[in-house]
Design a protein with these regions (language model features):
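Conserved glycine-rich Rossmann-like NAD(P)H-binding loop of the short-chain dehydrogenase/reductase
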Residues: 25-40
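Aromatic pocket-lining residues of Rossmann-like dinucleotide-binding sites
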Residues: 22
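Conserved mid-core segment of classical short-chain dehydrogenase/reductases
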Residues: 85-88
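Conserved glycine-rich cofactor-binding loop
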Residues: 11-12
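Conserved Rossmann-fold cofactor-binding substructure of NAD(P)-dependent oxidoreductases
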Residues: 55-70
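Rossmann-fold cofactor-recognition segment
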Residues: 45-58
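Rossmann-fold scaffold of SDR-type NAD(P)-dependent oxidoreductases
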Residues: 8, 75-83
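N-terminal Rossmann-fold NAD(P) dinucleotide-binding loop
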Residues: 15-16
């Protein structure tokens, strides 16, 4: 069975590169993005892509539920990369 990882902040930069790299290494990657259009783009690349926006707690809960439902309640790794490039 493939190992699973949830990576936040996959719209661009480090998160996007990490998602592609982990997929290339055989992991099942849940590539979370803040905007629906980015999730759609990631899905077109073959990723599972939950919508998770750290400023909207309901998306965090829904996104995590989506991931845990898809994996049977387990996750091997988390890379909390989201919003590292945002000021504030």
């Amino acid at each position: 069975m493939k190992k699973t990882i949830l990576i936040t902040g996959c719209s661009s930069g480090i998160g996007l590169d990490a998602a592609r790299g982990m997929r290339d290494r055989g992991w099942r990657v849940f590539a979370a993005c803040r905007q629906q259009r980015d999730c759609d783009r990631m899905r077109a690349e073959g990723f599972d892509s939950p919508l998770i926006d750290y400023t909207k707690p309901d998306t965090i809960a829904a996104g995590l539920d989506q991931v845990l439902t898809a994996t049977g309640g387990t996750l091997d790794a988390l890379f909390n990369n989201g919003a590292h490039g945002l000021p504030g």
